[in-house]
């Protein structure tokens, strides 16, 4: 095999890899940039309910039937209202609206067709008030939390009719403040984010918000960082995982102590990792989604990375380039064998199997395989006495 042929084959393989990465992220065609952030504290989210995907957009609540590939998006409620999140109780929906200075919470009894404002009173500095995020109790639909710039974390046990303050503190950056309940231990509440001097933190209450423990430098990454939305192992409730700025945080003792995997020096694993999720069927498989802004000659991009050992190590990320300066990831969910990524540009569907296959594929010389290893072409057909070209041997792409 001469040098020119080798170079041609390698270029073809690189082109094949780039094309495969582009095809991995399948846009669901929302039709408008509904995920665009409306301001510094805007965090639009999405939810999977049965076979339906509900997405909070700048123009209201939209839904898509995930069981039908060609289903159209439908506006289902809160038309023209910039939404960040919602909680559902039967036909009742409590929606978190993006706004400045008031009118944050909207209650509907008919799925969002009509609604009334139920925002609690804002005693002081109303013009500075924001409600960045909302969290629903995993088993009690009447119980939920919202975060408030001026009042801290508020708890309601009657679906938003009345509120009490759990703590007056939330982290300083409203665009990266996350609150929630532990899904298996809902008496555990967290507030993660970024402090006043940009250090990463997570505050945890183990007694339903009565007392709080702060974890900052103990996370293993002192200095400029942020702890984004935590996720929880489905069968080991002591294991939590959260993305950071170029790193991944992991705990195996219910949030008491943390370790940090720092990937800032590794281009294949570095990103602002915002959302992560354990696989429903294979709990030691974890997915994490993030993004990078435009830098020099490189455009903005969305990144997706996976781990098959519970988050202790990660395969190189798969990348989708974007025309946007910064295509921020708003949320990550799963539906069966697919991941759903909500970014500022669209909602994307990604096959879990294809993601893992592309992440674990490596290029190596055929001489490292045994003579008994069968070769397949790129269409999956077995090849006897393969000639010069690109083949799949032992589940890896090989240049021969």
Segments predicted by a language model, with ranges:
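Conserved Ser/Thr-centered positions that define the repeating blades of beta-propeller domains
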Residues: 63-67, 108-109, 138, 156-157, ...
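Residue-level detector of functionally pivotal "anchor" positions at catalytic/ligand-binding pockets or at interdomain
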Residues: 350-381
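Repeated scaffold domains used in trafficking and secretory/extracellular systems
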Residues: 39-47, 80-88, 127-135, 174-181, ...
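Short glycine/acidic-enriched loop and turn motifs that connect beta-strands
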Residues: 60-62, 98-102, 151-152, 194-199, ...
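C-terminal tail/sorting-segment detector
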Residues: 3, 390-400
């Amino acid at each position: 095999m001469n040098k020119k042929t080798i170079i041609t084959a390698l270029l073809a393989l690189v082109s094949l890899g780039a094309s495969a990465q582009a095809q991995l992220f399948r846009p669901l065609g929302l039709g408008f940039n509904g995920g665009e952030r409306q301001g510094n504290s805007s965090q639009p989210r999405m939810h999977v309910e049965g076979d339906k995907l509900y997405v909070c957009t700048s123009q209201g609540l939209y839904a898509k039937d995930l069981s039908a590939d060609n289903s159209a998006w439908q506006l289902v409620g809160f038309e023209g209202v910039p939404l960040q999140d919602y909680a559902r109780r039967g036909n009742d929906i409590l929606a978190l609206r993006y706004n400045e200075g008031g009118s944050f919470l909207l209650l509907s009894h008919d799925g969002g067709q009509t609604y009334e404002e139920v925002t609690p009173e804002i005693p002081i500095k109303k013009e500075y008030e924001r409600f960045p995020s909302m969290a629903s109790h995993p088993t009690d639909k009447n119980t939920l939390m919202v975060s408030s710039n001026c009042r801290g974390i508020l708890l309601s046990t009657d679906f938003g009719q009345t509120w009490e303050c759990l703590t007056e503190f939330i982290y300083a950056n409203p665009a990266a403040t996350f609150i929630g309940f532990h899904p298996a231990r809902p008496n555990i509440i967290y507030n993660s984010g970024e402090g006043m001097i940009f250090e990463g933190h997570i505050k945890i209450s183990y007694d339903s918000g009565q007392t709080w423990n702060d974890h900052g430098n103990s996370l293993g990454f002192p200095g400029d960082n942020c702890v984004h939305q935590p996720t929880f192992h489905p069968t080991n409730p002591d294991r939590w995982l959260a993305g950071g700025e170029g790193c991944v945080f992991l705990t195996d003792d219910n949030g008491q102590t943390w370790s940090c995997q720092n990937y800032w020096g590794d281009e294949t694993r570095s990103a602002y990792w915002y959302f992560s999720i354990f696989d429903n069927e294979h709990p030691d498989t974890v997915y994490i989604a993030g993004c990078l802004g435009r830098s020099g000659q490189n455009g903005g991009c969305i990144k997706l990375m996976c781990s098959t050992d519970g988050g202790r190590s990660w395969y190189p990320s798969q990348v989708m380039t974007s025309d946007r300066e910064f295509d921020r990831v708003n949320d990550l969910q799963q539906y069966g064998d697919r991941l759903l990524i909500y970014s500022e540009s669209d909602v994307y569907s990604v096959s879990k199997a294809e993601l893992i296959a592309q992440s674990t594929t490596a290029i190596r010389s055929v001489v490292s395989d045994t003579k008994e290893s069968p070769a397949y072409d790129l269409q999956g057909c077995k090849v006897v006495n393969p000639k010069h070209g690109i083949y799949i041997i032992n589940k890896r792409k090989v240049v021969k």
